[in-house]
Regions:
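Asparagine-rich low-complexity intrinsically disordered tracts
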Residues: 1-4, 70
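Compositionally biased, intrinsically disordered low-complexity regions used as flexible
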Residues: 4-5, 133
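N-terminal amphipathic alpha-helix/helix-capping segment at the start of soluble metabolic enzymes
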Residues: 5-50
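Alpha/beta enzyme core
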Residues: 37-39, 46-184
Length: 184
């Protein structure tokens, strides 16, 4: 009878007993989140000695490269395995082609190099693959004649991905929404 209660079907199998008490729910729960499951987003800003609040996200800040490492150290101390980097690009670096995304001295590339130099492989780095931080029009896709040119955009995204990987990025996270961007 016990075997049927464990492996059988209703009405022999009654799983409500697993949900009856707090201790039993905790015992059989599928997921148990820990800091090992988190990725810490870090928003970057050019300059020195800045921790700039982001008004649309209370309690969240943009950090300059000189402030970045103290924030990364907190992540490592709290056993967060990875950071995700997101740049805030000054208008003077933006153009309609997202050229700054391909600059090996852009903010994200500098941050990757700094984190890898200081922390080696003690923390992973994820980077957003997208052009919107770098385009003057704010779209992920390149625009010609008021249309997104998907295939040309993909070529630029490939170059951006390769650059981030060459700098030491561990995980590429494409968010651009272009058709066919994976697998080319």
């Amino acid at each position: 009878i016990l075997f049927k209660m464990i492996t059988g079907k209703f009405p022999s199998l009654r799983l409500r007993r697993n949900r009856k008490n707090d201790w039993s729910r905790r015992l059989v729960e599928e997921n148990n989140l820990s800091s090992n499951d988190f990725i810490l987003p870090i928003f970057l800003i050019d300059g020195k000695n800045k921790k700039q609040p982001i008004s649309s996200m209370p309690g969240v800040y943009r950090y300059t490269l000189d402030k970045l490492c103290s924030y990364v150290e907190k992540a490592i101390k709290n056993k967060i395995p990875m950071v995700a980097l997101f740049p805030y690009t000054k208008t003077k670096y933006k153009d309609s082609f997202g050229t700054e995304a391909l600059n090996e001295n852009n903010l994200v590339c500098k941050a990757i190099l700094e984190i890898k130099k200081r922390y080696k492989n003690n923390i992973g780095i994820m980077c957003d693959v997208a052009l919107d931080p770098y385009t003057s029009h704010g779209h992920d896709g390149l625009i010609k004649s008021n249309q997104i040119v998907n295939d040309e955009t993909i070529e630029t995204l490939i170059k951006q991905s390769l650059l981030q990987a060459e700098m030491g990025c561990d995980v590429l996270a494409p968010s651009d929404m272009m058709d066919g961007r994976i697998g080319k």
